């Protein structure tokens, strides 16, 4: 699709996607969807220009509280449940993601970012979030023992992190 091709181009030539976005974004809801989908890699990387285009400002006035995991140790094949709260000191559009630094076969680590939601938060509002991440081996992902890191990202900024053991 067009958005997939633009996303691929953005990985090596992000300025070209920005040119297309300048021409297409805001002209029609369909083209807006294409541009947003094309920007998915840059959004996951926390690219400030990409976040700004879609109305995500810096997250200085957003606090993350009580990031906890139900267990600090999980076995391969189990799931990690984690939760947290966010609170804002102003009305703001937020993109909430989490990243896991997975241990790979030779001990190196690879980060994968997962989107939780895109929403609005009101001034003085507190919102709870709970997610479950499976550590079951898949054909596309094999899990390895070791210390992994969970990070919560709001509008491209890591707000809190914690380590957990996969055994």
Sequence positions of predicted segments:
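Alpha-helical scaffold domains
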Residues: 1-166
């Amino acid at each position: 699709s067009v958005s997939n091709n633009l996303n691929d181009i953005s990985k090596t030539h992000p300025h070209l996607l920005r040119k297309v976005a300048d021409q297409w974004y805001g002209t029609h809801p369909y083209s807006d969807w294409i541009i947003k989908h094309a920007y998915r890699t840059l959004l996951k990387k926390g690219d400030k220009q990409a976040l700004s285009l879609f109305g995500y400002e810096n997250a200085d006035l957003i606090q993350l509280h009580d990031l906890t995991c139900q267990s600090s140790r999980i076995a391969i094949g189990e799931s990690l449940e984690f939760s947290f709260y966010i609170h804002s000191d102003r009305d703001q559009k937020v993109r909430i993601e989490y990243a896991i630094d997975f241990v790979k076969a030779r001990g190196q680590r690879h980060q994968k970012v997962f989107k939780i939601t895109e929403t609005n938060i009101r001034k003085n509002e507190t919102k709870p979030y709970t997610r479950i991440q499976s550590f079951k081996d898949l054909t596309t992902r094999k899990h390895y023992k070791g210390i992994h890191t969970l990070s919560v990202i709001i509008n491209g900024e890591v707000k809190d992190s914690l380590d957990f053991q996969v055994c």
